[in-house]
Curated annotation (Swiss-Prot):
Listed name of the protein: Major vault protein
Molecular functions per Gene Ontology: identical protein binding; protein kinase binding; protein phosphatase binding
CDD domains in the record: MVP_shoulder
Position(s), cross-link Glycyl lysine isopeptide (Lys-Gly) (interchain with G-Cter in SUMO2): 444, 704
Source species of the chain: Rattus norvegicus
Cited Pfam families: MVP_shoulder, Vault, Vault_2, Vault_3, Vault_4
MVP repeat windows: 2-56, 57-111, 112-164, 165-217, 218-272, 273-323, 324-379, 380-457, 458-520
Amino acid sequence: MATEEAIIRIPPYHYIHVLDQNSNVSRVEVGPKTYIRQDNERVLFAPVRMVTVPPRHYCIVANPVSRDTQSSVLFDITGQVRLRHADQEIRLAQDPFPLYPGEVLEKDITPLQVVLPNTALHLKALLDFEDKNGDKVMAGDEWLFEGPGTYIPQKEVEVVEIIQATVIKQNQALRLRARKECFDREGKGRVTGEEWLVRSVGAYLPAVFEEVLDLVDAVILTEKTALHLRALQNFRDLRGVLHRTGEEWLVTVQDTEAHVPDVYEEVLGVVPITTLGPRHYCVILDPMGPDGKNQLGQKRVVKGEKSFFLQPGERLERGIQDVYVLSEQQGLLLKALQPLEEGESEEKVSHQAGDCWLIRGPLEYVPSAKVEVVEERQAIPLDQNEGIYVQDVKTGKVRAVIGSTYMLTQDEVLWEKELPSGVEELLNLGHDPLADRGQKGTAKPLQPSAPRNKTRVVSYRVPHNAAVQVYDYRAKRARVVFGPELVTLDPEEQFTVLSLSAGRPKRPHARRALCLLLGPDFFTDVITIETADHARLQLQLAYNWHFELKNRNDPAEAAKLFSVPDFVGDACKAIASRVRGAVASVTFDDFHKNSARIIRMAVFGFEMSEDTGPDGTLLPKARDQAVFPQNGLVVSSVDVQSVEPVDQRTRDALQRSVQLAIEITTNSQEAAAKHEAQRLEQEARGRLERQKILDQSEAEKARKELLELEAMSMAVESTGNAKAEAESRAEAARIEGEGSVLQAKLKAQALAIETEAELERVKKVREMELIYARAQLELEVSKAQQLANVEAKKFKEMTEALGPGTIRDLAVAGPEMQVKLLQSLGLKSTLITDGSSPINLFSTAFGLLGLGSDGQPPAQK
C-alpha cells in the first residue's frame, strides 16, 4: 500500500520501491536508511523485509533482473532495471536480497527435496539445455534422480513423480513393461510394450521407461496340487523348455516348489491330485500319449492304489468309481464295445462287439476300456408265496418264477404285468371282503397304499368261504380257487371281476369285487307293490342267502358260481317279481292282515301238505327256501322290515287308524292308572291324618315348656331392667362429653390448618411475583447490554473497515487540498493589518480562490 509520509525510515534488511512520477521509473531503496521522499516521488509500499533463503531451501523468482558477469544488475536507458520477462530464476541459500520492481516471488521459501534411498525422482526436460557435465539435454528427455541425495531444482526440469522402490519378497516377482525402447537394469534391450519379470529378492527401483504392472505371487505347489498353465505365445521358460502358443501343461512339485507364472503363461487353475484307493478305479477320456498330445476318442483304465494328475485335455468319464466287489448273490451284465479276449491263456474267451454276458460273484472286477457295464444285478430273494415275471429277450417267452431266490441271466429281463384299472384299484384298496363288505363302494382307504410292483407276481388272498375265478386267455380256460387260499396269476391269467348291484333299491354295477362270498349273508331291497284294490305299498325286505355247492373239486359245478355276473341284482329282480304277482291278487285289508305269510309264500313258493281242509282238499304249505339253479343261490329266509303306503291319502288313513288304536289303548291304560292313583291317595290320606294327631300332641308338650320358660324370663327381666337402664344413661353421658371435647379439638386443628394454608398460599404468590419481576429486570438489563455490545461492535467494525489511514485522510483532506491549491498558484505575498480589523485566516484561502466559507464558489448574480 502506498504511503504519503515524507520521511520513511527503512530498517536493516528491509526495502521499499520508489516511483518517480516524472519519469515513471521505479527503483529500490535498501535499509538501513532514512529516506526523504521528494515531491515527484511516490513510495509504493511500506518497508518490506528482504527475501531470506535459509540453507537447504530455495525459492523461485519470476521475471528476474538481468545481471552482468560481475553479478551486477543491468539497467536500461531510462534507469529501469532490465528484467528477463517470462523467465524464472531459482535462488538457493544466500544473503537476504530485495525484489526489484517487476520481480515476483512465484514460489515461496521451500525446503529442498531430499531423495531417500530406494527412491528416485522422475525428471523431464522442459527446455533444451546443457547439464553440468556439458552434455546437451533435449526438451522431452526423461531420466531418474536416484537417492540418497538432495535434489537441486532447475528451471528447465520438471519433476514428474516420485518413484518408490518395490520390495520383492521370497516367492514373488515384479512384472514390468517397457514404455519405449530401453535397456533394463541388467543391460538387456527391451522394445516398447515388452513385458518381463524381475525375480531377484530385494528392493527394485524401476528405470525411467519401466512401468510396474503388478507384483506377482508365486503359486506354492504341494504333492497334492499342480498348476495348469497355457502359453500365450511362443517362448522358452526358465528350464529351457520351448512352449508353443496355446500349448497347455502342468507344473508339479517335482518341477518346482513355488512357481511364479511368466508373462507369457496364463494360469488356468490348480489341478488337485487324483488318488485311487485299493478298491477304486477310473476311466480317463482322451488320455495323453507318449508324444505329449491327447489321443482323442481313446480311453484308459487306471486301477488303484495310485495317485496322479490329470493332464490338460484329460477328463474322467464318471469320476472315481468303486471296484465292483460281487458277492455270491450278485452279478454284472457286461457288453463288449470292441472285439476282445478275456481269461487266461488256456481259458481265453473271445467276445465280439455288442456281445452281452453275465459274470457272477464272488469276485472283484474292474471293467476294461472295451467293456461297458450295463447293470449290476442282484439275486431276487423269493419266499414260497412270492414270485417274479421273467421274459426271455431272445424268444419273448414270459414265465413266472415262484418260491426260490433267482438271478436273471444275460438274456432275461423283468417283465411288467399290466392289469385292468378296475383290478388295480381293487388290489390297492386293501379292503377285507368279509369285514368291509358293509361299507360303500366309493369309500377310500385312510392311507393309500404304495403303487404295485408290476414285475412281482400278482397274488390275492381269498378269504374263508369265498371263491375267486381266474381266466387264462391263452389256454382259454378258467379255474376257481376257494378260500382260505393265496391265488397267484400266471403271465396270461386275469381275475374275473364281479359287478354287483347295491343300494336300496338295488342299482346295477354299484359294487365291484374280485372274490365271491359263499354266504350265509343277507341283502336288503326296497320294492313297490300294488294290491287288488290299487293300494300302492313300499316294502323293505331282507333276504338271507348262501350258495350250495356239492362238490368243490368239480370244475363244472364250481364254474356255475360265476355263471351269473350279478347274482344280487338277478335274485332281487326275481323275488320282487314274485312278490308283486302275489300281492296283486289280494286286497289291502287282506295283505295288511297276512302280509308276512303272503310274502313268504310268494318268495319261497308252496307245496301241498298232508293236511286237508273241511272239504277234504289238501292245504298248501310254504317251502323253507328258494333255490336259483343257474348258480346254486339259495334264499333261506325273508324279513319284512317295513311296509309303507306310497299314496299319501292311504298313508294318512293308515296313520289315523293307527293313532285311533293308540288312543284306545292309551285311554284304557289311563283309566287303570287313575284307579290305582285314587287307591294310593286314600292310603296316603289315612297316614296323613294319623301323623297330624301325633304332631298336635307333641305341639302341646312344647307349648307347656314354652310357658314355663317365659315365666322364668319375665322374672329375670324385671330385676335386670333398672340396672341396665342406669348403666346405659351413664355411658351415654360419658360418650357425649368425650364427643364434645373431641369436636372442639378437631375444630381448632381445622382452623390452624386453614390459617397455615392461607399463609403458605400468600407466601407462594409473593415469591412468584418477585421471581417474575426479577426475570423481567434481568431480561431488560440483558437486552440493553446486548444492544450496547452491538453498537460497540458496529462502530469497531466500521473503524476497522475504514482503517486509521482512511479516517486520518478524511480528517485532513480539506486543509491539505487548500494548501496544495495555494502551492499550485505559486503566490508569495505579505499581509499587514492592524488589530482593529481582524482577518479570518481560516477562510483566507477560500477567499483567494474565490470560494465561499463552505468551499463552494459563490452564485453568479
